[in-house]
Amino acid sequence: LSLVGSEMCIRDREYGLADRLEEMNRELIALSKKAAQGKALVAADMTMTGQQLYPIGDLMFEDLVEVYKEQAKVMVEAGADLFVVETMMSLQECRAAVIAIKEVCDLPIMVSLTYNPDGRTLYGTDPSTATVILQSLGADVIGINCSTGPEDMIEPVKKMAEYAVIPILAKPNAGLPELENGVTVYKTG
């Protein structure tokens, strides 16, 4: 699994790594390929940029597609076997990433969003809408990851299943952390 933020995310957080985006992506995929020893697929991982799209922010949708496209090109050239677009909170960013990948290659694309306990993303998208839109754009798998733990994934997955004609992914985390007697604990449920 190769996980590197987009050039925009790296530059805006001022880590001084924007000029190493291509190198880091290539190296991560090479290391992953070496570790897999031909026994596993290597996924190029993309996630949120941390930027707000217009009209909330200044970033235009077309420019965001180009950011993801630049990263996708490098990952394809480096030998990625598939793409995982994950932990997304914005359907618009998901759309931009899928469009960018589709413009670059025909590798499989798995897309997963993270949902709040109310069953919507941070930006208000429900699972049914996300499923219909992302599979119509060519996603090969639609799903949910992280969020607030396994129990809160049941209803969103059921809603996805009503419309999905592609496989559904559910990849929970340990839930939200809680502090008990000064110790962080995860009450998975």
Label the predicted regions.
Residues L1-E7:
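Single conserved hydrophobic/aromatic residue that forms the stacking wall/gate
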Residues Q37-V42, A78-L82, C105-I109, G138-D140, ...:
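Short, well-ordered coil/turn segments that N-cap beta-strands
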Residues E7-I10, I144-S147:
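Short, thiol/selenol-centered motifs that function as redox-active sites or metal-ligating centers
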Residues T87-C105, T148-V165:
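Active-site-adjacent beta->alpha loops and helix N-cap segments on the catalytic face
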Residues F61-G79, E86-M88, A100:
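Metal-dependent enolase-superfamily TIM-barrel catalytic cores that perform enediolate-based chemistry
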Residues S32, M75, F83, I142:
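Conserved, mostly hydrophobic/aromatic
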Residues Y15-L31, F61-K69, L91:
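Glycine-rich anion/phosphate-binding loops
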Residues A40-Q71, V111-Q135, P156-G189:
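Active-site-adjacent loop and "lid" segments of alpha/beta metabolic enzymes
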